[in-house]
Structures are given as structure tokens and as C-alpha cells.
């Protein structure tokens, strides 16, 4: 029987590419078991928790509540090593302009859409939304960047980004028409807008750092 201290729970609320996330985690798990789960009890028993997400924010919030997982997510965010990915990062904030919906409110701040009037290069060439593809991340000090060079490229697919009220949360910045926050961290929580599971060696290194992290 697997001990709780050996498990990494990947929260399944029907809105993420969970196979890619779980396979990447298994690659770096070092003997810990990766469990994809919609069971709040399994989330509560896990040593650490990964909260992925993709799709529209209103759908993500609705599905999270429909599966009775809100309380489990909020509890895990208080006291376990916790990694949010993509919409899983956005849902940690108070509100999203996508559908004008309230989110979980773990962090103060909002989720904003890329501003159309800023979506161009200095040459005048238009930038497409969603922001899709590889882009450089400028780091701010955090244990989860260990072994990853500043300016490394990660894979993004998104039209919205977080705007924290407290800039001390910001652990990574990217630029696409405008500079935007692409990673946040506080205490036991680290969350990223990009997809580490799709980001080759550096993405796997970040996941490995999370698996080993003792905040």
C-alpha cells in the first residue's frame, strides 16, 4: 500500500491534459507515486499536489465545484507543496476577466486578457492571441528555478495572464506585446502560466525541483 508521504496528487476536475502532466511527473518522481484523482480524500492524504488546468476559466471553476474539489484545493494550498499550472495558476487569484468570474482567492489579484492595442512588435507586425509557443522567462529567486538558466524558454498556450496585487509574489516574467507575470510563489505554493510538462529539459527540471522541494 502506498504511503501518503510518497504520493503526488494531480487534481482531475475534467479540465486539463492530465496524461502529459502525470507522465512528466512520473519521469522525475524518484519513487513517489503519481496519482491522478478527483477524490478529495486522496488529495488530502497526498504529500504534495499538482493543480493543472486548461480551457475557459468559467468552465474550470464550474467543473471544480461540480466535483466537490474546491475545499480540497484550498486546504492543500494552505499546507502542502502545491504546483499550479496554466489555468491552475489563474484560478488561485480572486477574479478573472474571462467570463467575469470569481476564482479561488488564494492570492489577491486578477486575471487579465492580453490587450489588443499592445499586441504588436516594434516593426508593427501583429502578435496573435492566444500566445502560443516557446518564450523566455526572466526569473526572480526561487528554489524551483534551481538548475534552470535565467532566460530559459518554456512552452505557453494562453490568452489571459495573472496580475498579482502583491508584486512580491512574482517569481517569473515573460514578454509578449507586454511584460506579464508567468510565475508566482509564496510559502508552499508555486504556480506557472507555462506548461512545464511540454517544456523539454527545463520543464522536467522544474517538476523535479517541485518533487524534491521542502518549503
Curated annotation (Swiss-Prot):
Q: Which Pfam families match?
A: GATase
Catalytic residue list: 86, 195, 197
User: Which reaction(s) does the protein catalyse, per the Swiss-Prot or TrEMBL entry?
Assistant: 5-[(5-phospho-1-deoxy-D-ribulos-1-ylimino)methylamino]-1-(5-phospho-beta-D-ribosyl)imidazole-4-carboxamide + L-glutamine = D-erythro-1-(imidazol-4-yl)glycerol 3-phosphate + 5-amino-1-(5-phospho-beta-D-ribosyl)imidazole-4-carboxamide + L-glutamate + H(+); L-glutamine + H2O = L-glutamate + NH4(+)
Q: Which Enzyme Commission number(s) are on file for it?
A: 4.3.2.10, 3.5.1.2
Q: Could you tell me which residue ranges the Glutamine amidotransferase type-1 domain spans?
A: 7-215
Q: List the disulfide bonds.
A: none
Q: In which pathway does it act?
A: Amino-acid biosynthesis; L-histidine biosynthesis; L-histidine from 5-phospho-alpha-D-ribose 1-diphosphate: step 5/9
The GO terms describing molecular function are:
glutaminase activity; imidazoleglycerol-phosphate synthase activity; lyase activity
| One CC-aspect GO term | cytoplasm
One GO biological-process annotation of the entry reads: L-histidine biosynthetic process
Gene3D superfamilies reported in the protein's UniProt record: 3.40.50.880
Q: What keywords tag this UniProt record? A: Amino-acid biosynthesis, Cytoplasm, Glutamine amidotransferase, Histidine biosynthesis, Hydrolase, Lyase
Cell compartment(s), UniProt: Cytoplasm
UniProt cross-references to PROSITE patterns, sorted A to Z: GATASE_TYPE_1 (PS51273)
Q: Main role?
A: IGPS catalyzes the conversion of PRFAR and glutamine to IGP, AICAR and glutamate. The HisH subunit catalyzes the hydrolysis of glutamine to glutamate and ammonia as part of the synthesis of IGP and AICAR. The resulting ammonia molecule is channeled to the active site of HisF.
Q: How does it assemble?
A: Heterodimer of HisH and HisF.
**Which protein is depicted?**
Imidazole glycerol phosphate synthase subunit HisH
Q: Which organism is it from?
A: Dechloromonas aromatica (strain RCB)
Amino acid at each position: 500500500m502506498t504511503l501518503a508521504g510518497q504520493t503526488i496528487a494531480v487534481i482531475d476536475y475534467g479540465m486539463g491534459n492530465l496524461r502529459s502532466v502525470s507522465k512528466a511527473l512520473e519521469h522525475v518522481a524518484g519513487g513517489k507515486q503519481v496519482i491522478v484523482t478527483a477524490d478529495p480524500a486522496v488529495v488530502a492524504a497526498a504529500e504534495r499536489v499538482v493543480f493543472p488546468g486548461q480551457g475557459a476559466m468559467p468552465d474550470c471553476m464550474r467543473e471544480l465545484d461540480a466535483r466537490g474539489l474546491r475545499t480540497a484545493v484550498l486546504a492543500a494550498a494552505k499546507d502542502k507543496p502545491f504546483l499550479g499550472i496554466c489555468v491552475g495558476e489563474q484560478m488561485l487569484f480572486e477574479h478573472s476577466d474571462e467570463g467575469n468570474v470569481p476564482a479561488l482567492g488564494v492570492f489577491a489579484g486578477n486575471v487579465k486578457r492580453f490587450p489588443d492595442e499592445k499586441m504588436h512588435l516594434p516593426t508593427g507586425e501583429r502578435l496573435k492571441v492566444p500566445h502560443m509557443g516557446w518564450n523566455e522567462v526572466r526569473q526572480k529567486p526561487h528554489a524551483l528555478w534551481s538548475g534552470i538558466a535565467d532566460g530559459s524558454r518554456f512552452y505557453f498556450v494562453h490568452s489571459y495572464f495573472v496580475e498579482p496585487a502583491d508584486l512580491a509574489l512574482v517569481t517569473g516574467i515573460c514578454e509578449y506585446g507586454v511584460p506579464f507575470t508567468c510565475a508566482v510563489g509564496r510559502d508552499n505554493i508555486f504556480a506557472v502560466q507555462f506548461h512545464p510538462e511540454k517544456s523539454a529539459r527545463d520543464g522536467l527540471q522544474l517538476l523535479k525541483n517541485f518533487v524534491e522541494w521542502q518549503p
